[in-house]
Amino acid sequence: MKIYEFSRILGILLDNAIEAARECEEKMVRVEIRKDSIQNRQILVIENTYLDEKVDFEHMFEKGVSSKKHNTGLGLWEVNKILKKYPNVNLNTSHDGHFFTQQLEMYEDVPSQKEIPVP
């Protein structure tokens, strides 16, 4: 993934998390970045409080679906569009009525036989 694409995804997910948490009595956003050497991946987790009734979970990644006024937000649709280009990157979304979690998993590319140097 190109750095500008990662930056765009990070910005969208953080903006959404902050915006959702601001509407809650308990305002909480947690960001975690870690490396999983066993599965050879980097993981970005963004978790926030949210108001359950404002989120259309079934359609949230579709173009034109937004919690913003007049459905002006394109953020998650744009995230989805970027992610479709990278089979080694997954976004897992979960919610429990109090916390909304986005977990971005970026797996290392495995070099093909042609790329492996021969001594």
Regions picked out by a protein language model, each given a short descriptive name:
Residues 27-29, 88-89:
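Glycine-centered, small-residue-biased loops immediately flanking beta-strands
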Residues 40-73, 115-118:
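Glycine-rich/acidic phosphate-handling loop/turn and adjacent ATP-lid/helix
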Residues 48, 104-110, 117:
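C-terminal beta-strand of the catalytic ATP-binding
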Residues 87-96:
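Glycine-rich ATP-binding loops of the HATPase_c
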